Design a protein with these regions (language model features):
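Non-catalytic substrate-recognition and accessory regions of acyl/acetyltransferase enzymes
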Residues: 1-77, 84, 88-106, 110-149
Length: 149
């Protein structure tokens, strides 16, 4: 996806100790940023749709920034937490927003209540459940959550 210019992946490094004992970078976490247009469910209030779209309360699609593959290196899990990683992603999105606009951040969470609750606790609202077909032809449920920026 990176080579096709569909996304950008960011690494979070340990600024106090950039290299590990093998002289490799100490990668604490990573996340990917992209964009995506999502269809807004009819059950979303018109006032919310206008807030997300910026103009149209009847908008059917909203262009979003997509935070994907947010994760941390388990080796350094005591050094960094999910909120720091998420805040790093949002900081970059806010910079991009100043150049090209848009109002909404989207995450598509795995079907795990702890992960979903993490996003809700960080200002996201669950709007939809979708199903995708994985590379090995299995159906996987994802939860779409959005946050206004």
């Amino acid at each position: 996806m990176e080579e096709a210019d569909k996304t950008r992946t960011y690494l979070v490094l340990d600024e106090e100790n950039i290299y590990n004992e093998n002289e490799n970078f100490r990668i604490l976490a990573y996340f990917s940023l992209s964009t995506k247009s999502i269809q807004i469910a009819r059950k979303v209030a018109k006032s919310k749709v206008r807030e997300f779209d910026g103009i149209n309360k009847n908008a059917e699609n909203i262009d979003c920034y997509l935070i994907g593959q947010l994760g941390k290196n388990e080796i350094y899990k005591d050094i960094i937490n999910g909120k720091i990683i998420l805040d790093s992603a949002i900081d970059i999105i806010e910079t991009i927003k100043s150049f090209i606009g848009r109002r909404v951040i989207l995450v598509e969470s795995v079907d795990d209540e702890k992960v979903i609750q993490f996003y809700i606790n960080n200002g996201f609202t669950k709007i939809e459940e979708i199903e995708i077909i994985t590379k090995d032809d299995k159906i996987e449920k994802l939860h779409q959550l959005i946050r206004r920026i």
